[in-house]
């Protein structure tokens, strides 16, 4: 984990960060149609996820929080989503095809859960729901950095999340989370009632991440 809060609320669930989908991708045994289905759904996911991060700007209490949230929105829209577009284009799947695809139920369940927290909760609620995706993919990048699948798009995917650029995104988000919790709850945030609530949110989002992988394997 990258942070103080992260060490308390860390991604330890191997059902997520070492899911069979990622294992198969890393050793070149994942069927390409499953990966393309995942990319399509993840593209739709990132559209909603970007909106949720935009809500983090609204929920922020200071300029530093706003800057990190805004930077994350930029990374999602202008870099991560572009990766999906470029990988899919190699297989004849256009940007229009991606945008007009139907969302799977697991995708809807996850993104709407996060957005609802963004609308109804405070920044800590929202960040706790967003953290498993950002930090989990960072952990996946570290775990599989040295794997070397022959399939180009699998290679490219692993390189993206293991890259210094993405790891820096994780560090910035972790720093945002740390400071946001300490600002609002104090140094002893683990002992607060709020901590119990946000842990439940974090764990729920982690389970929804696992469901997303399971959907991709169908």
For each predicted feature, which ranges?
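Single conserved hydrophobic/aromatic residue that forms the stacking wall/gate
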Residues: 1-6, 10-11
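Helix-loop segments that flank and shape redox-cofactor active sites
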Residues: 20-33, 49-68, 119
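Short, charged/polar, low-complexity loop and linker segments
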Residues: 21-27, 114-116, 184-192
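Active-site-proximal alpha-helical scaffolds that flank and shape metal-associated catalytic sites
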Residues: 66-172, 203, 207
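Acidic interhelical loop/turn segments
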Residues: 148-154, 183-196
């Amino acid at each position: 984990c990258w942070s103080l809060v992260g060490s308390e609320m860390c991604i330890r669930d191997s059902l997520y960060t070492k899911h069979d989908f990622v294992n198969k991708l890393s050793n070149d045994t994942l069927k390409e149609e499953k990966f393309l289905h995942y990319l399509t759904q993840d593209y739709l996911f990132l559209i909603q996820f970007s909106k949720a991060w935009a809500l983090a700007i609204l929920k922020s209490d200071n300029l530093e929080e706003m800057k990190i949230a805004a930077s994350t929105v930029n990374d999602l829209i202008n870099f991560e989503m572009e990766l999906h577009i470029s990988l899919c284009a190699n297989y004849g799947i256009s940007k229009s095809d991606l945008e007009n695809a139907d969302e799977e139920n697991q995708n809807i369940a996850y993104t709407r859960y996060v957005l609802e927290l963004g609308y109804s909760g405070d920044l800590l609620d929202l960040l706790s729901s967003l953290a498993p995706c950002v930090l989990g993919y960072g952990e996946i990048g570290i775990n599989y950095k040295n794997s070397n699948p022959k399939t180009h798009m699998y290679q490219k995917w692993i390189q993206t999340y293991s890259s210094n650029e993405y790891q820096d995104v994780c560090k910035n988000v972790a720093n945002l989370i740390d400071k946001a919790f300490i600002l609002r709850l104090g140094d002893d945030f683990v002992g607060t009632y709020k901590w119990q609530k946000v842990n439940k949110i974090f764990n729920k989002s982690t389970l929804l991440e696992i469901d997303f992988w399971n959907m991709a394997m169908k």
